[in-house]
Amino acid sequence: MRPSSYNQRTLSKIASLQGVGLHSGARVTLTLRPAPPGHGIVFVRTDLARPVSIPALAEYVVDTSLATTLGRDGVRVGTVEHLMAALAGMGIDNLRVELDGPEVPIMDGSAAPFAALIQSAGVREQEAPKELLVIRKAVSVVDGDKQASLTPARHFRISCTIDFEHPVIQGQSFDLDFGDRDFAREISRARTFGFLRDVEKLKQMGLARGGSLENAIVVDEVSILNPDGLRFPDEFVRHKILDAIGDVSLFGRPVIGHMTAYKTGHALNHKLVRKVMSDPSCYEIVPARRRELEGMGLGFSGLAGALDFEPLVA
């Protein structure tokens, strides 16, 4: 019998891991706790005298200079994008994310450890349909030669291009169609990257304290410094897509639309999300039920790959 809706999801049990923060260098324990339908993803700083909850929503973004940082009442949670990408990529809607430090652990610099943690905990379907944010008209933002846009589509797709004047990176493009269930296989393992000259400057500023070749791709002027090289020939652009997925997930709902990104980063991704949210005519919130979706001209069965995720890790 065909399903009549795509329902919200949480974890089947509590799961946790430990790691260091990329910028703080602090040892942090991250714990994922199942949450009820409609709860959303909420970060909780448990290391404070009074725990502070910060919803994973665009309105709580307070910094995008080096990573995506959420904040509330003066309390911050940094580097949320890789975890958020894993949750979005594996269809998790409701979760309490506890941290005993200021930053989500960087792990290996990708989303794969978080995807594996989700897989180990198991996924539980809940008795409520997902709510989708359907893009209804084109929205774009520009910053110099950088640009990003969201346009109407039948499911979620990201087309990303980067262009660096560097012999190893240069120009790379990648197109991810969530209808093909490619996140775990094609994107989750792509690591963050940086230039050696920038890493040295950041460390002098007291940042990137937890950064190493174990959790980032580092390139000098001509080559990759990591002994094991790359996981994909185009790992750089794949990681940019991973970041974009994490940033766009701060809509608080799965997106139905096509994101096109050229030389974007966290700041421009967030600017795009905020611009969409500022104009209600740009989007529509729709329950992921067959009746409503087919009434909008969105093929219900065609969304299976984008919404009926399989918790698999390559």
UniProtKB/Swiss-Prot annotation:
Its cofactor is Zn(2+). Keywords: Hydrolase, Lipid A biosynthesis, Lipid biosynthesis, Lipid metabolism, Metal-binding, Zinc. It holds the Pfam family LpxC. Pathway: Glycolipid biosynthesis; lipid IV(A) biosynthesis; lipid IV(A) from (3R)-3-hydroxytetradecanoyl-[acyl-carrier-protein] and UDP-N-acetyl-alpha-D-glucosamine: step 2/6. The active site is at H266. Its EC number is 3.5.1.108. HAMAP family: LpxC. Belongs to the LpxC family. This is UDP-3-O-acyl-N-acetylglucosamine deacetylase. It comes from Myxococcus xanthus (strain DK1622). The gene is lpxC.
